[in-house]
Curated annotation (Swiss-Prot):
Residues 249-329 are annotated as: Handle region. The N-terminal region is involved in phosphatidylethanolamine-binding and is required for atg8-PE conjugation. This is Autophagy-related protein 3. It is found in: Cytoplasm. GO terms for biological process: autophagosome assembly; autophagy of mitochondrion; glycophagy; piecemeal microautophagy of the nucleus; protein targeting to membrane; protein transport. Monomer. Interacts with atg8 through an intermediate thioester bond through the C-terminal Gly of atg8. Also interacts with the 40 amino acid C-terminal region of the E1-like atg7 enzyme. Also interacts with the atg12-atg5 conjugate. It comes from Neosartorya fischeri (strain ATCC 1020 / DSM 3700 / CBS 544.65 / FGSC A1164 / JCM 1740 / NRRL 181 / WB 181). The active site is at residue 245. Belongs to the ATG3 family. Residues 85-167 are annotated as: Flexible region. One of its GO terms (cellular component) is mitochondrion. Residues 135-156 are annotated as: Disordered. Residues 144-156 have a biased composition (Acidic residues).
């Protein structure tokens, strides 16, 4: 059944009519040209990502240029398997999570579905905070910080056999580090990006496909995420793939909320009575802050010229027409959203943001 589904999905993408009309702002979908633009931005801003070609000309799609058939990043670390500490474990109710921009009477469709965790998830947050590590500008993970209260005094415990803390049998959290190659392709049928994942136990030992599901949030397994052949390679290499059927609607919701958050921030800035107050408002980034750090970078020819009074006036004049997320920043936001499906895989390692 999986083979049939994979084959039908591939042919559906290749035979669907190609859209050349941009509906990015109204539908969350992008055209092949916009996918290339967003891919160029991702590669330019985050060099761990690169464009790649199909393994043979017969595997190429006509609506994307040769050499830019898909995007790939390699060797992304995955330090732990998903277990009951992550959302998606069976036996827990689902919960709709809304943000501050949604009213009390908002539709369930306007919120995020926190799968599997339900109310119990809040009780686990304190324990999970201990596993939080920082990411520097280069994308390197920082060391875990020990709780000072848990650090034994070596002078008091010297030669004290009872002071030696031994981990109970079966409770070890040490797990073999896996790595993943991530591939972003364009789905011509859904007109959105699509993510494929290929895992490795070591640089020379591929991870069996069924074991990749250990790194997928439980409620997504075999539903949103399935095992399929990668259409751009010869030989039928099996990968885990995040199905793109809901990508456009989720991205549209993110775009709308980012624009709303940006509008609120602009309104507050207009009412600011001092430079200090304006700086404070600017520091309180909302959803649009996902890409604020990359706002000054663009691959368009209209990139900023030399700084000066004239440029400041132009920015002031055009400010109301700006959007929170541009189409060339699409894949940056897409990867932030897709990370919720595979929280054990360190997606920020590929981006350093």
């Amino acid at each position: 059944m999986n083979i049939l589904h994979s084959t039908l999905s591939t042919w559906r993408d290749r035979l669907a009519p190609v859209s050349r009309t941009s509906t990015f702002r109204t539908t969350g979908q992008i055209t092949p040209e916009e996918f290339v633009l967003a891919g160029d931005y991702l590669v330019y801003k985050f060099p761990t990502w690169a464009w790649a070609d199909a393994s043979s000309p017969a595997k190429r799609v006509s609506y994307l240029p040769p050499g830019k058939q898909f995007l790939v990043t390699r060797g992304v670390p995955c330090h732990r398997r998903l277990n009951e500490n992550f959302a998606g474990d069976a036996g827990h109710e689902d919960e709709i999570v809304r943000d501050m921009l949604s009213g009390a009477d908002a539709d369930d469709g306007d919120g995020w579905l926190r799968t599997g965790g339900g109310r119990d998830l809040a009780e686990k947050q304190a324990e999970r905070i201990k596993d939080v590590r920082t990411v520097d500008e280069s994308g390197n993970m920082g060391e875990r910080e020990d709780d000072e209260e848990d650090i034994p005094d070596m002078e008091d415990d010297d030669d004290d056999e009872e002071a030696i803390i031994r981990e109970p049998a079966g409770k070890s959290t040490t797990q073999p580090i896996r790595t993943y190659n991530l591939y972003i392709t364009y789905s011509n049928f859904y007109r959105t990006p699509r993510l494929y994942l290929s895992g490795y136990l070591s640089p020379s030992e591929p991870l069996p496909p069924h074991l990749m599901m250990e790194d997928i949030v439980g409620d997504y397994k075999d539903k949103t995420v399935t095992l399929e052949d990668f259409p751009w390679f010869d030989g039928g290499l099996k990968m885990a793939s995040v199905h793109p059927c809901r990508h456009a609607s989720v991205m549209k919701t993110l775009l709308d909320r980012a624009d709303a958050a940006l509008k609120i921030r602009r309104d507050k800035l207009k009412q600011a009575h001092s430079a200090a107050e304006a700086n404070r408002i600017n520091s309180e980034r909302g959803l649009e802050g996902l890409v604020d750090e990359t706002r000054g970078l663009s691959l368009n020819e209209q990139q900023g010229h030399a700084a000066g009074g004239d440029e400041w006036e132009v920015l002031q004049h055009d400010e109301e027409d700006q959007v929170a997320i541009r189409v060339d920043q699409y894949l940056v936001v897409f990867l932030k959203f897709i990370a919720s499906v595979t929280p054990g895989i360190e997606h920020d390692f590929t981006m350093g943001v």
